[in-house]
């Protein structure tokens, strides 16, 4: 669990994410690799809340841009080689689950939008945390406002 998660968990607030949407994006890409260019326009690995989902996405993109076939075997080999999972069996179970639980491949852009929106909210929460911490250290309101504007603008 990262520092941001711990901070908000201590306040009784959970960081927003949709595991279903993350897994639907990955499952759709696994089943129909030609949707990857559409996904790359919207998502990056760091947009995924679950570390392993981001790593799987990175491998899918790497395979696709390298001209490799996107199928169960190539993706399995890639994520095992990348160390995303502790064992090959663990990777097989997870990837099989992704492929079996995709609600609809045709909705992959919608799922990608959900993943991206949750990421943006997490980024806003991180900026809010930074701004709050800075207010305890910086008494000058103009400096605080400028810093806060910059943090929001960067998102």
Residue ranges: model-predicted function:
Residues 1-119:
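Noncatalytic partner-interaction/assembly domains of nucleic-acid and motor enzyme complexes
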Residues 97-155:
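Interdomain "pre-motor" coupling segment immediately N-terminal to P-loop NTPase/helicase cores
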């Amino acid at each position: 669990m990262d520092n941001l998660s711990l901070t908000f968990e201590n306040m009784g607030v959970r960081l927003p994410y949709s595991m279903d949407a993350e897994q639907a994006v990955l499952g759709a890409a696994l089943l129909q690799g030609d949707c990857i260019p559409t996904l790359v326009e919207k998502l990056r690995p760091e947009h995924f809340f679950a570390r392993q989902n981001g790593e799987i996405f990175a491998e899918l993109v790497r395979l696709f841009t390298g001209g490799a076939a996107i199928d169960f075997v190539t993706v399995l080999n890639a994520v095992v080689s990348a160390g995303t999972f502790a064992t090959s069996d663990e990777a097989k179970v997870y990837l099989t689950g992704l492929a079996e639980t995709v609600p609809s491949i045709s909705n992959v852009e919608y799922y990608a939008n959900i993943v991206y929106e949750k990421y943006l909210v997490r980024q806003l929460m991180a900026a809010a945390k930074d701004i709050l911490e800075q207010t305890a250290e910086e008494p000058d309101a103009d400096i605080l406002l400028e810093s806060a504007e910059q943090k929001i603008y960067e998102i």
